Every structure is written in C-alpha cells, then in structure tokens.
Amino acid sequence: MFRIFIGWDSREAECADILRHSLIKHSSIPLDIRYLKIDELGLHRPRDPLQSTEFTYTRFLVPHLCNFEGKAVFMDCDMVCLGDIKELDDLDMTGLALRVVQHDYKPEATSKMDGCVQTVYPRKNWSSLMLMNCSMLKLWTKEVVDTQTGKFLHRFEGIPDEQIGEIPKTWNTLDWMDENTKLIHYTSGGPWFEQCKDHPYGEAWLRARDEYRASLRPAAAFA
C-alpha cells in the first residue's frame, strides 16, 4: 500500500479528514493514510514562534516512522486532491531522496490566515508535499528533527541538490487551480477560515467538504 502522512493540526482537524476522503475518492491503488499528531510522536522541541502549524516539524519524522524503508508521501492538511495519487507512486525515485514541487514562491502578504508571520525563505513550500525515498533520508533521525533549525529542515540542508527531484507542478498548485490541477493547496488560507470564506478557488474545498460530510451520514443514521 502507498503510505501517505497528513500533517494534522487541532485547529484544522476536519481539513485532514477532507483531504483523506479526496485522496481515497480519486485513488486507483490502496492507500495507507496516517495523521501526524504532535502529541503522539514524542517530540520535545519547544514551539518555534515562527511555526504556523503543529506539523511544521513533524513532517520530517516520516522516514523514521517508516523505519527508513520504502516510499512515503507527506502532505499539508490544507489541500484537496483532484487526481489519482498513483501518479506520484509511479514516479522513479532511483538516486533520489526526495521529489517536491519546486515552487519559486514569494508571498505578497506579511501575515498568514491565522495571524502568524508570513516568512519568506528559499525553497518555501517545497516541504508542503514531499515524495520521500526513506532509505536515503537517514539524516532525518528523531534527534535531528527534535533539535535542528527550521532552516536546516525546510531547506533540505544536508541533502545534495542532485538527490532532490521534481513533482509535476499540477500536484501542488498554490491558491489557484485550472482544469489540469491534481492537488490544490490553500497555503494562504482556505474557506474554513472566516477571513478566507470568499477564496476565489474555495469551491473545490467546499465541494470536497460536502462530499466528506455526506459520506458520514449513513453510518450516523445507522447508529
């Protein structure tokens, strides 16, 4: 089964459920989907004042959680899948530690949807979707994730550039979409936030939310 780890935040718990539902809906292969809940992972690092989510650092534990074997995907929870994730499973990882969408992203806003500071740094948003070759990411031990800087982790310092491959850009479109989009990422805030309820591409998330909630009704009625 293709392993997928979704970053989980207590403020956006339903977002993770909606993403999970959208992944399963469109997938032609079996998926093993897990949530990265910080309270269950044994990290002891103090909260970074610049981190905007509970999974800012937990994403880098994925190779450790996979015993540094096989492939796995990490995804932020503020996404909706519109394509078959098998396309990522089919990507060749020979000689690569990672594949990511290599954005050249420079946000215009100075703050995020929840009031956190919007920092700008090289390779911003590259770590929001990662296809990992876990056997080549032994650098990311639990101790390293617990102690290293955000700069070291999010910029993939210590990983040679030639070991960082690309994922097609259709698999992580930032706050927009078209007919080719496979995964939309509401990185500036989605319609679940009051201040973003009129997001120009929010309809995709609202539709996925309604489908997810509808999927719960038969079980609730039966109970």
Identify the function of each model-found stretch:
Residues M1-F5, R11, I29, I33-K37, ...:
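A glycosyltransferase accessory/donor-loop signature
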Residues S22-P30:
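Short, acidic, metal-binding catalytic loop of nucleotide-sugar glycosyltransferases
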Residues D32-L65:
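Active-site-proximal specificity loops/subdomain of glycosyltransferases
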Residues D48-Q51, D114-T119:
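Short, P/G- and charge-enriched loop/turn segments at secondary-structure junctions
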Residues F60, W126-L129, T181-L183:
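Extracellular structured ligand-interaction cores
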